[in-house]
Amino acid sequence: MIASCLCYLLLPATRLFRALSDAFFTCRKNVLLANSSSPQVEGDFAMAPRGPEQEECEGLLQQWREEGLSQVLSTASEGPLIDKGLAQSSLALLMDNPGEENAASEDRWSSRQLSDLRAAENLDEPFPEMLGEEPLLEVEGVEGSMWAAIPMQSEPQYADCAALPVGALATEQWEEDPAVLAWSIAPEPVPQEEASIWPFEGLGQLQPPAVEIPYHEILWREWEDFSTQPDAQGLKAGDGPQFQFTLMSYNILAQDLMQQSSELYLHCHPDILNWNYRFVNLMQEFQHWDPDILCLQEVQEDHYWEQLEPSLRMMGFTCFYKRRTGCKTDGCAVCYKPTRFRLLCASPVEYFRPGLELLNRDNVGLVLLLQPLVPEGLGQVSVAPLCVANTHILYNPRRGDVKLAQMAILLAEVDKVARLSDGSHCPIILCGDLNSVPDSPLYNFIRDGELQYHGMPAWKVSGQEDFSHQLYQRKLQAPLWPSSLGITDCCQYVTSCHPKRSERRKYGRDFLLRFRFCSIACQRPVGLVLMEGVTDTKPERPAGWAESVLEEDASELEPAFSRTVGTIQHCLHLTSVYTHFLPQRGRPEVTTMPLGLGMTVDYIFFSAESCENGNRTDHRLYRDGTLKLLGRLSLLSEEILWAANGLPNPFCSSDHLCLLASFGMEVTAP
């Protein structure tokens, strides 16, 4: 009985005493560790061999990690390591505890900690102030792009891993892999002006090149000389005396339009999109190529009158400008040097026609008739006039019907201005941004002079995009434009294709015979002398003769024009200066890159009859007339423009490339 009582009473008391002694030991040890500054204890203790006594030490260490880590770090940052006397006295208090069963293991642990504290005094590297606030390592990859190293954790993570000494942790921190440092994105968002990526749909984000782009080398354009190359007839373009001149066509990108479609220019640095920067670049480009005729599109009105026109006037140009109708702020301009040409007439063209749904857009054109000025050294010679047309056609890829109608109006105006007294045409140059790709129906219509459009999907006219997947497509119907427009299906004004009527009306014999027995003709005039056999008889009206004479229908006097069914034509015989293909690279030519997709939409057409030459590639595919192509500035491929970060860029300040060609006109004796 007594033994049972002792068993039930003494055993819990023993366990309680042991728990109190453990708590006292833990408290003493926490005080010591709280005043310690070296986490080397953690590293050595973590690497100690495991044993029965080690399990309790590991539990105490885990509690120290959870409760006293922040205090250890703060204490370490405030002062130097603790002195050895304090460490030895603290260890002595722990060693004098008679109730601790694992005193031997504690003795070994204390000895190791004391040696570690002595070794910590000889450390050369100071303890970092805050492990979690190390500065980010910034790596400059490309100009304008900032890349930073991976940020360190705010608190060291010790769970489920062996602890490392502070020295090892600091060393590993500064010896990070360079590849990781170079390609780890900083958590801070990169400003838009420092971004240098191409967010084009379907192309992902392209990293900018790591070196500075040599724009002058990448965008170098060769001059192609045709003056010694024979044409289809075997004649060289440079034979005989000629009046030579150069013409440039350039869409210079209106600032207002750029700001309205800013999503198209996210790949550009904001500085190169500034108008003042772009204006200087454009003027330098004009001065470098020094054309005799300059045809510009997307010319903003205020920039034209305030900067462009005065600057071009100082360069020796005379300029004509036509702003787009409606509330649009840009337009077209044609400039020429008065030392080379004399103006005969200028005709602005508006495509907007009130009341016609087909022609409700604000695009415009400009047609000039220029007389070349022959140098005095050539003597008494003459040169035919030159007709120059500049336009910017509607962009909308789905409205090919509008594009064709606008082009028909421009061709009718060119036909009227360029028509000579004998019915032929003087040399013609038609240029501008036509918003159509090569070999599209609109392009073929200009080059071939004929197009069968009836039933054609409207999106197919320009070839810019493929909308064949759409169920309901707008198709072209005949006639394409109403007769009230006053333009025939041959793209001529009705008043131009028929001879002008004289103010005096002319009547035929049959019409005049209607008045033979009218009432006034059957009355004897007063005072008429009676002459036998001549005036003595009264005219007798035949039976059934109408007394009243019907007037001739006015519509019969007006010449009527017939409409062809689904076909439009023109007789200007135009061909393109460019072939739209780069044989050296095996790539198509590119004049612009909307949304990162290179295409040709800018053209220079001139008067020259196209012809077929089979497989002969050494001759040009047209016959030279009065106007001869002497040379052109080569275009670039899409890959080259991609290498230059697209358009615009610091070297080219427009989203289009300029087109430049040299021509020669025959000089004849008067």
Swiss-Prot record:
InterPro entries: CCR4/nocturin_mRNA_transcr, Endo/exonu/phosph_ase_sf, Endo/exonuclease/phosphatase. GO terms for molecular function: catalytic activity; eukaryotic initiation factor 4E binding; mRNA 3'-UTR binding; protein domain specific binding. The modification Phosphoserine is found at residues 77, 105. The keyword Zinc does not apply. One of its GO terms (cellular component) is nucleus. SUPFAM superfamilies: DNase I-like. Keywords: Phosphoprotein. Belongs to the CCR4/nocturin family. This is Protein angel homolog 1. The gene is ANGEL1.
